[in-house]
Amino acid sequence: MAEALPKAGRYFCHSCTAEITPRLPEYTCPRCDSGFIEELPETSRNSENNSSNNSRTDQNRPSFENLESAQFTLPSGYGQVTFGIFNEGLDFPIFGTSGPVEETRDGESRREHQSRQRYGARQPRARLSTRRAAGRNEGVPTLEGIIQQLVNGIIAPTAMSNLGVGPWGVLHSNPMDYAWGANGLDTIITQLLNQFENTGPPPADNEKIQALPTIQITEEHVGSGLECPVCKEDYTVGECVRQLPCNHLFHNDCIIPWLEQHDTCPVCRKSLSGQNTATNPPGLSEMTFSSSSTSSSSSTSPTDENNSANNS
């Protein structure tokens, strides 16, 4: 009578770093034909039955090397999608009702993890499993659908409120505040610049603008190297310019549009009424220019100019 073959037990292949059922009677690994295997202790029959249905799919799962595990804390009532290596995972929310999280990892996974901890073997592959909250509502959008909507920039501020998790349950703020698409950053910068456009001093009074003296540029002005602070063009002899109470000179077309929006000098930020504490620029306060017969205001002091502007 032929001798019966020995019963195959549970073995761990150090070449494949996986739990195997050896090929008998050679006691070799059916995956790599290596004999570098070691018998593992027996476990309960229930664990063997629970792992039989899922053991075939483990070989078809993708392999990811050297993945660093991460854990994100999420509000209660969320399901979780776990991506990681065995007992360590990366969790993402799936919208659902509150309840205890149901563990779906099979018994073989726990045994393989214990074997790798025991023998110091490297992790051969990562697993992607889904842990759903108990009693998940049907028809609730999935994580993939929500991310796709956010990336496409088509989700509206009122859309997330219909998901039953409160507004902006995933993002930290309004999705419209994020930069979506190729031109998203440019749009945000433009919005920020528009917010600062109307800030600052109020427009100057039209009466004060019209009361600004007009003087004629002389050779003394040209010889001193004066230029319009706005357009940076040199003044020419005989050119008519407007003089502010701070003695700064500007082209009429350069200073009038500015004063219609801001009651300040573009150079020293002094208002037409002299309300701020800005001092006159050095040199101009002491300089006096001989003007033509059409205007004598250039030879007056800044105090006289302020008085004439207030009286007008």
Swiss-Prot record:
Chemical reaction(s) catalysed: S-ubiquitinyl-[E2 ubiquitin-conjugating enzyme]-L-cysteine + [acceptor protein]-L-lysine = [E2 ubiquitin-conjugating enzyme]-L-cysteine + N(6)-ubiquitinyl-[acceptor protein]-L-lysine
Keywords from the UniProt entry: Cytoplasm, Metal-binding, Nucleus, Transferase, Ubl conjugation pathway, Zinc, Zinc-finger
Location relative to the cell: Cytoplasm; Nucleus
ZnF start-end (RING-type): 228-269
Region Disordered: start-end pairs: 40-62, 97-132, 276-312
Chain residues that bind Zn(2+): C13, C16, C29, C32
Biased segments, Polar residues type: 302-312
CDD domains in alphabetical order: RING-H2_RNF126
GO biological process terms on file: positive regulation of double-strand break repair via homologous recombination; protein K27-linked ubiquitination; protein K29-linked ubiquitination; protein ubiquitination; ubiquitin-dependent protein catabolic process
Protein's pathway: Protein modification; protein ubiquitination
UniProt-listed Gene3D superfamilies: Zinc/RING finger domain, C3HC4 (zinc finger)
EC number(s) reported in the record: 2.3.2.27
InterPro entries: RNF126-like_zinc-ribbon (IPR039525), RNF126_RING-H2 (IPR039571), Znf_RING (IPR001841), Znf_RING/FYVE/PHD (IPR013083)
Enzymatic class: transferase
Protein name, as recorded: E3 ubiquitin-protein ligase RNF126-A
